[in-house]
UniProtKB/Swiss-Prot annotation:
This is UDP-N-acetylenolpyruvoylglucosamine reductase. HAMAP family: MurB. It is found in: Cytoplasm. Its cofactor is FAD. Belongs to the MurB family. NCBIfam families: murB, PRK00046.1, PRK13903.1. Its main location: cytoplasm. Residues 13-183 form the FAD-binding PCMH-type domain. Cell wall formation. Its EC number is 1.3.1.98. GO terms for biological process: cell division; cell wall organization; peptidoglycan biosynthetic process; regulation of cell shape. Pathway: Cell wall biogenesis; peptidoglycan biosynthesis. It holds the Pfam family MurB_C.
Length: 342
C-alpha cells in the first residue's frame, strides 16, 4: 500500500494504492486489468486524475491510461479525428487550431485526458463534447472485445453518459472519434464571449477569450490542488426556477430545450457568502465559488466536510441541493458523492 496517488490526482490528496500501472497501449491496459482481477483486486482506470477525490487508500490497482496518437481524415464536409484516450485534452484543442481545424475552442483548458471527455460529456461556454463526438472506441475488459459506440449510443446528458452507468466498470475507453465541420459556427452565448462580433470573430479569438476567462477565474492545479468545478450546475424544473427568480431576480438562469432551467452553482454558493471559507486544509476559491482548493495539505475528510457545509447552506437558502461533479473514490471503487456529502 505504499504507492502514493498524490502525483496522479490534481487535487493533490495524499492516499496510496496497492499498485499503479501506466498503460501505453490497449494490450498493456488489458493485461494490467486481467492480472489485478485474477488476484481479486479492484481496478480503477485513470486519465489525469483531474475529476476525482480519493476518500481513502485504494485497495487495488490503479491503471493510468496513456494510449496516445492522433489520426486525421479530411473529408469534404468535415475533419474526422481519431484520438488516443491518453492524449491531453487542452493540447488536442491547441493542435486542432494550429492545424486550421476549429470547433473545440470553447472547450480550451478543460483539464484531463481525451478518454475522460465522453464520460463527463465535458462542456464549457455553451459547447459540450456531444456536439463534436462521432464515436467512442472501448474495449471490454473481461474479453478484450473492441466496441465502437456512436455518439447517440453514448447517451450523453449534462455531465453524464453511458460510461457512468452500464459501461462504467466493464469497459475502458481507448479512443474518441471527433467530427469538426468545415463550416465553422462560433458559439458566443456565455461570459465574455457575448461581447465578440459573430460576423468577424475568428476561432483563435474565441480560444484566447476562453483561456483568459479560465485562467483569471480558475486556480492552476499545479499551484493549488483542485478538481475544477466541484459541483454541477443544478438543473431544476421551470416551477422551481420561477419561484427562485421571484425572490432572487438577478440569479443567472439558462432555460433548456426540455423546459427545465439550469442555474449557476457558483452564484448560489457566492450568495451564501462562502467564498474563501476554509475547513482544515481546503477552501472555497475566492474568485470562483464552484471550485474547492487544496490550500494546505488538505485531507479528504476536509473536502467532504466543506462540501457538506456548502451543500447545506445553499439548500437552506435556495431549496436547491447541489451535487458534486467530481467522482468520489473509496477503498474499492467509486461511491456515491451525493450520499457522502449529505
Amino acid at each position: 500500500m505504499n504507492h502514493s496517488l498524490k502525483p496522479w490526482n490534481t487535487f493533490g490528496i495524499d492516499h496510496n494504492a496497492q499498485h499503479i500501472v501506466c498503460a501505453e497501449d490497449e494490450q498493456q491496459l488489458l493485461n494490467a486489468w486481467q492480472h489485478a482481477t485474477a488476484e481479486g483486486q479492484p481496478v480503477l482506470i485513470l486519465g489525469e486524475g483531474s475529476n476525482v477525490l480519493f476518500l481513502e487508500d485504494y485497495r487495488g490497482t490503479v491503471i493510468i491510461n496513456r494510449i496516445k496518437g492522433i489520426e486525421i481524415h479530411d473529408e469534404p464536409d468535415a475533419w474526422y479525428l481519431h484520438v488516443g484516450a491518453g492524449e491531453n485534452w487542452h493540447r488536442l484543442v491547441k493542435y486542432t487550431l494550429q492545424e486550421g481545424m476549429p470547433g473545440l475552442e470553447n472547450l480550451a483548458l478543460i483539464p484531463g485526458c481525451v478518454g475522460s471527455s465522453p464520460i463527463q460529456n465535458i462542456g464549457a461556454y455553451g459547447v459540450e463534447l456531444q456536439r463534436v463526438c462521432a464515436y467512442v472506441d472501448c474495449v471490454e475488459l473481461a474479453t478484450g472485445k473492441q466496441v465502437r459506440l456512436t455518439a447517440k449510443e453514448c447517451r450523453f446528458g449534462y455531465r453524464d453518459s453511458i460510461f457512468k452507468h452500464e459501461y462504467q466498470d466493464r469497459f475502458a475507453i481507448v479512443a474518441v472519434g471527433l467530427r469538426l465541420p468545415k463550416e465553422w459556427q462560433p458559439v458566443l452565448t456565455y461570459g465574455d464571449l457575448t461581447r465578440l462580433d459573430p460576423t468577424t470573430v475568428t476561432p483563435q479569438q474565441v480560444f484566447d477569450a476562453v483561456c483568459h476567462m479560465r485562467t483569471t477565474k480558475l486556480p492552476d492545479p499545479k499551484v493549488n490542488g483542485n478538481a475544477g468545478s466541484f459541483f454541477k450546475n443544478p438543473v431544476v424544473s421551470a416551477e422551481t426556477a420561477k419561484a427562485l427568480l421571484s425572490q432572487f431576480p438577478t440569479a443567472p438562469n439558462y432555460p433548456q430545450a426540455d423546459g427545465s432551467v439550469k442555474l449557476a452553482a457558483g452564484w448560489l454558493i457566492d450568495q451564501c457568502q462562502l467564498k474563501g471559507m476554509q475547513m482544515g486544509g481546503v477552501a472555497v476559491h475566492r474568485q470562483q465559488a464552484l471550485v474547492l482548493i487544496n490550500e494546505d495539505n488538505a485531507k479528504s475528510e476536509d473536502v467532504v466536510q466543506l462540501a457538506h457545509h456548502v451543500r447545506q447552506k445553499v439548500g437552506e437558502k435556495f431549496n436547491v441541493w447541489l451535487e458534486p461533479e467530481v467522482r468520489f473514490i473509496g477503498a474499492s471503487g467509486e461511491v456515491s458523492a451525493v450520499e457522502t456529502i449529505s
